[in-house]
From Swiss-Prot:
<dbReference type="Pfam" id="PF00038">
    <property type="entry name" value="Filament"/>
</dbReference>
<feature type="compositionally biased region" description="Basic and acidic residues">
    <location>
        <begin position="430"/>
        <end position="448"/>
    </location>
</feature>
<feature type="region of interest" description="Linker 12">
    <location>
        <begin position="224"/>
        <end position="246"/>
    </location>
</feature>
<comment type="function">
    <text>Essential for the proper assembly of type I and type II keratin protein complexes and formation of keratin intermediate filaments in the inner root sheath (irs).</text>
</comment>
<feature type="region of interest" description="Head">
    <location>
        <begin position="1"/>
        <end position="73"/>
    </location>
</feature>
<keyword id="KW-0175">Coiled coil</keyword>
<feature type="domain" description="IF rod">
    <location>
        <begin position="74"/>
        <end position="389"/>
    </location>
</feature>
<protein>
    <recommendedName>
        <fullName>Keratin, type I cytoskeletal 27</fullName>
    </recommendedName>
</protein>
<feature type="region of interest" description="Coil 1A">
    <location>
        <begin position="74"/>
        <end position="109"/>
    </location>
</feature>
<dbReference type="InterPro" id="IPR039008">
    <property type="entry name" value="IF_rod_dom"/>
</dbReference>
<feature type="region of interest" description="Linker 1">
    <location>
        <begin position="110"/>
        <end position="131"/>
    </location>
</feature>
<dbReference type="InterPro" id="IPR002957">
    <property type="entry name" value="Keratin_I"/>
</dbReference>
<feature type="region of interest" description="Disordered">
    <location>
        <begin position="427"/>
        <end position="448"/>
    </location>
</feature>
<dbReference type="GO" id="GO:0005198">
    <property type="term" value="F:structural molecule activity"/>
</dbReference>
<feature type="region of interest" description="Tail">
    <location>
        <begin position="386"/>
        <end position="448"/>
    </location>
</feature>
<feature type="region of interest" description="Coil 1B">
    <location>
        <begin position="132"/>
        <end position="223"/>
    </location>
</feature>
<feature type="region of interest" description="Coil 2">
    <location>
        <begin position="247"/>
        <end position="385"/>
    </location>
</feature>
């Protein structure tokens, strides 16, 4: 807002106001003849935040005549002063009402468009914070529940893999045992065949022994029959060999020989069977120990593979959990950074608004001080005017009074309405013409 005072004719006051769309201006000029000598005072204009402009009263020069005494009718002069004071007080009251109206409008605007309103530039989401916290808690619990379910699925999958590996290992072990059993069956078949061969040989030898015994008995019977015949041969020879004894001896020799052969065959069979049995026992023990060792090694390998798979699965699960945790932390960090940025922006806006309110408060304090100073000056002028009137009343004589020529004071107040871009929308001129006994008020509208 700019305030300009210019003089035209006797004294003209003009006030130019610029605001968001409303302007208020008031000016007053008063010229009181006969008080002081060339004394003048001017009450300047001021600006209020929110589009309020006040142009204070411009009190014109109180001029006195060359004798320094009041001339004319003192009652009319005091009445003019009272009228001007009443007009000034009315202007002050009107400005106070306008100021209160603008303050109410500003308050309504802040309530409607300020922070905390639904249409404001800075929304207040404080009522949504409990809902957001509840939803965040539900999301965290659901995330933890999902992580627990995923962990249980991983554990179940690992358990299934372990059981599958155990089944495969047991199946391989079963197949290996079946193969060993089949091998042992082949060995058993070979041993059975060998035993059968030995039994056949034993039967053959037994049959041969029986056949030899039978032949021996037949020969013995034949010899006995031949010896027991009715042939009587008498010879005068030397006594011969006793055939019975000879046959008995031969039978004894053959029996001893057969027994010896049987013993030798049995000893040979026992020897061969013992070595074979020992070899079979050694081979069976070595096979059993090797099979046991192989089984232990397979079990150890299976256990190590299961542990390796479980460790790999645990590593994968921990890596997934770490990745998910890092992602969650990154998301939370980004949200916190966004909240920090929003809070910093809000803090900057609050500081800016605080600075603006501080400046407005300082301007209002300056306006208040200026108005108080103007009121004090006006009161001091009124007090001086009353003293001058009393002095003039005591010293005045009918012969020394001079007739004062009528004087005219013209006050022009220019009120302009501007848009936010500074363009003049409309302009009005208030003209106040005052005489010693008559006041004419005119209003002229100037098109923009």
């Amino acid at each position: 807002m700019s305030v300009r005072f210019s003089s035209a004719s006797r004294r003209l006051g003009s006030v130019r106001l610029s605001s968001a769309g409303a302007a208020l201006g008031a000016g007053n000029a008063c010229g009181v003849p006969g008080i002081g000598s060339g004394f003048s005072c001017a009450f300047g204009g001021s600006s209020l935040a929110g589009g309020l402009g006040m142009g204070g009263a411009s009190c014109g020069a109180f001029t006195a005549n060359e004798h320094g005494l009041l001339s004319g009718n003192e009652k009319v002069t005091m009445q003019n002063l009272n009228d001007r004071l009443a007009s000034y007080l009315e202007n002050v009251q009107a400005l106070e009402e306008a100021n209160a109206d603008l303050e109410q409008k500003i308050k309504d605007w802040y309530e409607k468009f300020g922070p905390g309103s639904c249409r404001g530039l800075d929304h207040d989401y404080s009522r949504y914070f409990p809902i957001i916290d509840d939803l965040r808690t539900q999301i965290i619990s659901a995330t933890a529940h999902n992580a627990n379910i995923i962990l249980q699925n991983d554990n179940a999958r690992l358990t299934a893999d372990d059981f599958r590996m155990k089944y495969e290992n047991e199946l391989a072990l079963h197949q290996s045992v079946d193969a060993d059993i089949n091998g042992l069956r082949r060995v058993l078949d070979e041993l059975t065949l060998c035993r059968t061969d030995l039994e056949v040989q034993l039967e053959t030898l037994s049959e041969e022994l029986a056949y030899l015994k039978k032949n021996h008995e037949e020969e013995m019977q034949a010899l006995q029959c031949a010896a027991g015949g009715n042939v009587n041969v008498e010879m005068n020879a030397a006594p011969g060999v006793d055939l019975t004894v000879l046959l008995n001896n031969m039978r004894a020799e053959y029996e001893a020989l057969a027994e010896q052969n049987r013993r030798d065959a049995e000893a040979w069979f026992q020897e061969k069977s013992a070595s074979l049995q020992q070899q079979i026992s050694d081979d069976a023990g070595a096979t059993t120990s090797a099979r046991n060792e192989l089984t232990e090694m397979k079990r150890t390998l299976q256990t190590l593979e299961i542990e390796l798979q479980s460790l790999l699965a645990m590593k994968h699960s921990l890596e997934c959990s770490l990745t998910e945790t890092e992602g969650n932390y990154c998301t939370q960090l980004a949200q916190i950074q966004a909240q920090i940025s929003a809070l910093e922006e809000q803090l900057h806006q609050v500081r800016t608004e605080t600075e603006g309110q501080k400046l407005e408060y300082e301007q209002l304090l300056n306006v208040k001080a200026h108005l108080e100073k103007e009121i004090e000056t006006y009161c001091r002028l009124i007090d001086g005017d009353e003293g001058s009137c009393v002095k003039a009343k005591g010293q005045g004589r009918p012969g020394n009074q001079t007739k004062d020529s009528p004087k005219t004071a013209i006050v022009k107040t220019v009120v302009e309405e501007l848009d936010p871009r500074g363009k003049v929308l409309s302009s009005r001129v208030h003209t106040l013409e005052e005489k010693s006994t008559k006041v004419n008020k005119t209003e002229q509208r100037i098109p923009s």
